[in-house]
Amino acid sequence: MLKTNQKNVHAFEIEKQEPEAVMEFLEKNHALLQYFLIIFKYDIEPEVKVILHKHQLLFLETNRPLNGRHIKTMSLKEETNHSKPNHSKTEPKTTIYERHIRSGEEIYSANHLIFLGNIHNGAKIISEGCVSVYGVCEGAIVCFGECLILKEVKSAQIVFQNKILSLKEVERLLVNKNIKIITKNDDILDIKEVL
């Protein structure tokens, strides 16, 4: 009997563009991209493949359309213009972790997640819901929810709604220990500090 395992995968789809832009993206974000399948919607150039192999990134070349759930956010203006609420979609539950998340520990969840302890370097959090971290965050965070709340950040490995935070955006999180709320309006990332 054939032994198989079924896995859920988060992926980045890359459309056809200049190889230099793709190589720069891969070099800059290779540490975070190790957690994703990278799907190229075209035949990859040899120089791009060199970067993929160099960082041992998992990738797929295909022209076939892929089914799956696309992460789509609705602006606050669109949300408030609805005349009646949509109750057909169930709201994710909230899971609270009062303990520290240790190095090497991985948490995958469809729920909203609240962390009262620290997330240590080498830990990985992936959530379909919102994520709130009130301890020190040194690990990798991948949040597909409406918002990401962070207090003391010491990590550059943060993905919010399929966008890898740039060094400039991460630096805004590192300046102090105040709570920061990250949201996204269209493709614009908004980082607000709560005093």
Curated annotation (Swiss-Prot):
On the tree of life, the source organism's domain of life is Bacteria
- Provide the GO biological process annotations: cell morphogenesis; division septum assembly; regulation of cell septum assembly
UniProt xrefs under Pfam families:
MinC_C
Q: Keywords, A to Z? A: Cell cycle, Cell division, Septation
* Keyword Cell division part of the UniProt annotation: yes
Give the record's family classification.
Answer: Belongs to the MinC family.
Subunit structure and binding partners = Interacts with MinD and FtsZ.
Q: Which PANTHER family does the record match to this protein?
A: SEPTUM SITE-DETERMINING PROTEIN MINC (PTHR34108:SF1)
Instruction: Name it.
Output: Probable septum site-determining protein MinC
Q: Which organism is it from?
A: Helicobacter pylori (strain P12)
Q: What is the lineage of its organism?
A: Bacteria, Pseudomonadati, Campylobacterota, Epsilonproteobacteria, Campylobacterales
